Amino acid sequence: MSIEAAENLRAAEALLSALMGLGLQRVVLCPGSRSGPLALAASRLESHGLALTTGIDERSAGFFALGQTRADGQPTAVITTSGTAVANLLPAAVEADFSALPLLLLTADRPERLKACGANQTVNQEAYLQPACRALLQGPAAGLHDASDERLLRLAQSAMRHALGAPAGPVHLNLAFDEPLHADLSGLPAAAPPAAQELPPLFEPPGLGSLEPLDPDQPGVIVVGPWRRGHGGRFVAALQQLNRRTGWPILADASSGLRGLPLPLVSGYDLLLAEPQRLPPAHQVLRLGSMPASRRLQQWLQTFEGPQLVITEAEPRRQDPLASGCAQHPHGLAAWVELLPTGEPSATSRADAARWQQAESLLQQQLDHDLPLQGPCSEPALARALQNLIPSEWPVMLASSSPVRDWESFAGRQSGHRTIVSFRGASGIDGTLSLAAGIAQQWQRLVLVTGDLALLHDANGWLWRRQLSGELRLVVIDNGGGGVFEQLPIPRQSMDFDRLFAMPQSCDAMALAAAHGVAARDCSAMETLAADLQWLLEPGDAMRLLRCSTDRSRDAQLRQQLRDKPWWEQTPAP
């Protein structure tokens, strides 16, 4: 049976309109013919507020959309054609899955009658993203034109329900379209405005049970992992209330979103944990969210003999890679704090907290001395200096690998609150620049701190510059590639370390930036960093790059020297 191209457009428009009525505000569109009806529909709906961005690389587009979602927690849709285009969405879907971020992946497909018969660009794409997605949803096998508006509304409701549930995450909508695909718009009426729809009930974790065996009157430690959806004002208020009740010190990951807030945080715990036997004795640990990056912290938690309770925010999946937690509550910190008996911190808890804070203060003073704004650039010194020199109104994204680890160990306290972003879910370096561009598009400004290999891995991320309405500033730490492997216990003497692990590249980041019309500047000495950052943050350009050249072998030695210091010897015993 033949169909009219307008029928495909009608169905695509009805689906996108239904998604908009449920809260979808933006779409990232990749090129393709089979996805033509969705492209035309998205274009027609721009007049009703749909923000449309286009990108030629599906992998990059997936990460750009994920960056937008990370910025405000609202779902973003990506539209692609059929075939390998779908496979390129998998890295972003994996990160969205681990980070619990809502992402709608709309992929055009051939009708069922063209499957498994050798038809061009017809693959088993419905299976490609399924392991990483909350749900696989499909339209009619004959084509989306065969769906009524009511069925398309139910499809949209199901997609949003899965994407925004507990946990939030990516949803794959695989949509078959039959030919003809491209309608003539000249005789068609304008798209109707989307009708507001009530979002169906979201998936929620099971109810909160009785109070787990943590005693607020005994000494304890609070460990806060990287930011997740739900770590907003209610979470912070509950943490402040918990601290007033227990007095427990708070060991907060650099990307927890807490540094700079009025909380008694311990930022230098990674270095202080070099001598765990010197720590004030704790009877229990409360872990909030996923695991921080610090390996020393993980080792300490793995050998800790007291109870460890894990509390997550609408995340029912297990968040205990060390298998050391006694239980996990997925309903959030605020609900758990409400169950605590009233009271005040014990004298022992107050004394222990004071000792933690004293050690933290002395450690930060010593790091100021050990990592001055002098001499050649080093990665530990850069982490500390960037924290202090970048104005707090500029959010910072830390690329996976060395930057996030150095910021965790050496950046120290923040004088004012700053949003720090990292993607520690799958810890991939693919999509780094595109992620940052998506965040900058929503927040209007962002500083990305990245290594040279992570930047090179997402070279197509430069292409977002032309459509970027915000300001993205790149600090590229060029250490000749693979500096993170210098920090791992790899026996270098018995192998070709550079060839097998570091994999240094010859691509010039500044030349690559220039090829895309991006202004770039070089920094090789700490003395010039403040002036270089002032240039970097000047308004006007969509993107700018500052390259900081470092020596990864020398930096590896510096890190080890700092990690081996007896930090607790500077702190008087109680």
Swiss-Prot record:
Enzyme superclass (EC): transferase
Gene3D superfamilies on file: 3.40.50.970, TPP-binding domain
GO molecular function, one term: magnesium ion binding
A Pfam family per the record: TPP_enzyme_N
Enzyme nomenclature, EC number: 2.2.1.9
Reactions that this protein is recorded to catalyse: isochorismate + 2-oxoglutarate + H(+) = 5-enolpyruvoyl-6-hydroxy-2-succinyl-cyclohex-3-ene-1-carboxylate + CO2
Pathways involved: Quinol/quinone metabolism; 1,4-dihydroxy-2-naphthoate biosynthesis; 1,4-dihydroxy-2-naphthoate from chorismate: step 2/7; Cofactor biosynthesis; phylloquinone biosynthesis
SUPFAM superfamilies xref list: Thiamin diphosphate-binding fold (THDP-binding)
Keyword entries, A-Z: Magnesium, Manganese, Metal-binding, Thiamine pyrophosphate, Transferase
CDD domains cross-referenced by the UniProt entry: TPP_PYR_MenD, TPP_SHCHC_synthase
Keyword Calcium tagged: no
Note on cofactor: Binds 1 thiamine pyrophosphate per subunit.
GO biological process, one term: menaquinone biosynthetic process
Cofactor(s) recorded in Swiss-Prot or TrEMBL: Mg(2+); Mn(2+); thiamine diphosphate
InterPro entries, per database record: MenaQ_synth_MenD (IPR004433), MenD_middle (IPR032264), THDP-binding (IPR029061), Thiamin_PyroP_enz_TPP-bd_dom (IPR012001)
Record's subunit section: Homodimer.
Family stated for the protein in its record: Belongs to the TPP enzyme family. MenD subfamily.
Function per UniProt: Catalyzes the thiamine diphosphate-dependent decarboxylation of 2-oxoglutarate and the subsequent addition of the resulting succinic semialdehyde-thiamine pyrophosphate anion to isochorismate to yield 2-succinyl-5-enolpyruvyl-6-hydroxy-3-cyclohexene-1-carboxylate (SEPHCHC).
UniProt-recorded name of the protein: 2-succinyl-5-enolpyruvyl-6-hydroxy-3-cyclohexene-1-carboxylate synthase
Gene that encodes the chain: menD
